[in-house]
């Protein structure tokens, strides 16, 4: 199965353009598609769905705002239609209003892909957005 990962620090290639950053996982995938044009079209479609500007493909990752970088990181995690997306503190660098907008966009994409999202966060206010919650502190306390 295919797994998408959203890193806390995004790990975008600063010298590569947005589309190259998004399709990067496909190049390392065992189920690599031979059609590069379709990969780029899929990446542009994800950019549009995540409300990135129409000309976003002309920018290098290093020139993007933090919010744009996060959206590119989400697109990169979703490009292969993963069954599981693992997100490590994907909203940690955003204020509360931007967090809600970003999470709405991310959850919409996860739902469209019918993926499962496993998100790590220290922000307990995010808990209400999820179907299931595991509090590691409680688990460790019960185990001891």
Residue ranges with predicted function:
Residues 16-25:
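Short coil-to-helix segment of the ABC ATPase nucleotide-binding domain corresponding to the Q-loop/switch region
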């Amino acid at each position: 199965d295919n797994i998408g990962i959203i890193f806390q620090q995004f790990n975008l290639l600063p010298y590569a353009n947005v589309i190259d950053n998004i399709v990067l996982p496909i190049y390392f995938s065992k189920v690599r598609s031979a059609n590069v044009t379709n990969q780029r079209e899929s990446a542009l479609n994800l950019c549009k769905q995540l409300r990135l500007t129409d000309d976003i493909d002309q920018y290098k990752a290093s020139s993007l705002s933090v919010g744009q970088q996060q959206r590119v990181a989400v697109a990169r995690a979703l490009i292969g239609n993963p069954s599981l997306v693992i997100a490590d503190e994907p909203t940690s660098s955003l204020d509360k209003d931007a967090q809600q907008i970003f999470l709405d966009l991310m959850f919409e994409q996860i739902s469209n892909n019918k993926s499962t999202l496993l998100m790590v966060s220290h922000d307990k206010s995010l808990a209400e957005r999820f179907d299931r919650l595991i509090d590691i502190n409680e688990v460790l306390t019960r185990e001891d």
